[in-house]
């Protein structure tokens, strides 16, 4: 099992809108059987205004299929697009980390 962390460093004052988008995305993922994301914000760290979205995936192949929207209905794809519309305006910098869960 893999742990995928999407780390978004938001622009000043844009953490709350990014959290709201992430929570809506998590609910939609759960609704469509893709699992839920865990959403976290920083209390202290290397950079301020950080939002972390964590999810689990059985394999890189499964994660890749999810990112491509394979098996998703057209309506679900449109819902995802609507939720994430404009998120680039909220984010200054981002990265993805992938870990193997050992126990």
Put a short name on every predicted segment:
Residues 9-20:
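Short, surface-exposed ligand-recognition loops at beta-strand->loop->(often short) alpha-helix junctions
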Residues 20-38, 56-95:
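An amphipathic, aromatic/His-enriched active-site/gating alpha helix that lines ligand/cofactor pockets
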Residues 9, 54-56:
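Short hydrophobic/aromatic beta-strand micro-patches
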Residues 1-2, 103:
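Absolute protein N-terminus
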Residues 3-8:
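Active-site-flanking beta-strand signature of metal-NTP-handling nucleotidyl enzymes
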Residues 94-102:
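Long, low-complexity, Ser/Thr/Gly/Pro-rich intrinsically disordered segments that act as flexible linkers
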Residues 41-47, 87:
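A short beta-turn/loop motif at secondary-structure boundaries
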């Amino acid at each position: 099992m893999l742990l995928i962390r999407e780390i978004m460093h938001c622009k000043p004052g844009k953490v709350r809108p990014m959290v709201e988008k992430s929570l809506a995305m998590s609910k939609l993922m759960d609704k469509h059987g893709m699992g839920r994301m865990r959403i976290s914000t920083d209390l202290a760290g290397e950079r301020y205004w950080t939002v972390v979205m964590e999810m689990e995936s059985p394999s890189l192949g499964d994660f890749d299929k999810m990112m491509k929207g394979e098996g998703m209905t057209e309506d679900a794809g449109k819902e995802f697009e609507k939720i994430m519309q404009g998120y680039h305006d909220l984010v200054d910098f981002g990265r993805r980390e992938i870990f193997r869960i050992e126990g």
